[in-house]
């Protein structure tokens, strides 16, 4: 198929975009080991009737919703997120936006739950406050999904960290979702299955 007329710059942009993502998803033993370690933690926690709490802002919140539903329904691992407008607005009003998530974890978290935090920038204050205080509330381990600066604040609180070497929100968020859904399929043991 030939290139549509007068679209060479768009083709070049898309070629670079796809190649950037292709490099991120190239097989990498370090990432594989972290995914395996994380999945084993998740399974172990599930067997103890503990849950995973996942949170993010904006696109990362949407990813957390998708992951929590698929993980609970398809992999049979309990997972919750805090994307209810009433919870966010109530807790933000009462505790301030920077502390609403920390307080949601305080109220809903249970001893030895796992906490997954997604922040493309790694600098979201509500995510940082949640990470900083989660273990005080009994959270066992924190798994972070970040991008931009390798030494970002959110990553510094993680026991396992998935950092994306990019400064593009969409590239970072797409890769975070790819990693999280890979965890679901890794726990199930296959990527094709009936959705019942």
Question: Where in this protein do the model-derived segments appear?
Answer:
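Generic N-terminal amphipathic, Lys/Arg-enriched alpha-helix
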Residues: 1-29
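Short, structured helix-loop boundary elements
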Residues: 11, 32-35, 98
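A short alpha-helix capping/helix-coil boundary motif
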Residues: 18-22, 29, 47, 83, ...
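A short, well-structured juxtamembrane/interface segment
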Residues: 27-48
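Glycine-rich phosphate-binding loops that contact phosphosugars or nucleotide phosphates
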Residues: 43, 53-196
